[in-house]
């Protein structure tokens, strides 16, 4: 009898290992992952319509926010760790913490429209935004990229890695970085932009006429024009040009 019971238990364990079944999702949803990988892979559609604001709290996850050709939100991820979301009114709140540094990613695909607010706090991994939003706030200690987006108000605070603003249209931007963090603004149209770094370089290529802008190299400057570019670095190089 003991021998038969032992054979049954071994058989159950063998099937469990072979299927590679893991549990992972907004609370605890079952999904499958290759047995040779410690990463958990998931893909989840958010059925609620009318979401106009996104809040993401993440750690050790490379975050990307895109548009896609669908009227619902899609969340896809690949990492080992915890993930959940909840919706309050029209706010989608996502939490995604990976257990260790690595090739971790969390991608959020959104219906194509202008969003009211996107707030992203991400530690130890990159953050990349490719959607239009009225108010965008990013707090990080790693690389930040905002590319080909229309932004009403942009605020970025980060350490250590570079910030890249590429081919965007922005009304007002405040970008503050610590340490030797480089700020790059490339082919971007902006009305007001304040760039501050402790010791990194600042390179800004602005779409517009130089004569329309007041350019400041210190914070304490009286405004004489509606359009302002302020660039301040404690030790780094500053280059501002117009195209």
Language model feature labels by segment:
Residues 1-243:
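Intrinsically disordered, low-complexity terminal regions
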């Amino acid at each position: 009898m003991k021998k038969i019971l032992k054979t049954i238990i071994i058989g159950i364990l063998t099937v469990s290992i072979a299927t590679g079944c893991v549990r992972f999702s907004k609370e605890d949803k079952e999904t499958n992952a290759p047995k040779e990988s410690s990463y958990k892979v998931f893909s989840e559609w958010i059925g609620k319509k009318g979401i106009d604001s996104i809040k993401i709290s993440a750690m050790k996850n490379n975050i990307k926010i895109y548009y896609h050709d669908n009227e619902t939100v899609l969340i896809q991820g690949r990492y080992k760790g915890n993930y959940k979301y909840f919706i309050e009114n029209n706010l989608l709140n996502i939490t995604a913490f990976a257990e260790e540094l690595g090739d971790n990613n969390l991608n959020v695909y959104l219906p194509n429209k202008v969003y009211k607010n996107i707030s992203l706090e991400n530690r130890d991994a990159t953050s990349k935004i490719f959607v239009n939003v009225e108010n965008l706030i990013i707090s990080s200690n790693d690389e930040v990229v905002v590319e080909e987006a229309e932004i009403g108000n942009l605020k970025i605070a980060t350490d250590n890695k570079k910030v890249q603003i590429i081919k965007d249209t922005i009304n007002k931007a405040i970008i503050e970085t610590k340490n030797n963090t480089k700020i790059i603004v490339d082919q971007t149209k902006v009305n007001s932009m304040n760039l501050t770094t402790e010791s990194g370089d600042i390179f800004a290529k602005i779409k517009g006429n130089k004569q329309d802008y007041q350019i400041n190299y210190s914070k304490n400057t009286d405004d004489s024009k509606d359009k302002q570019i302020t660039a301040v670095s404690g030790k780094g190089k500053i280059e501002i040009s117009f195209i």
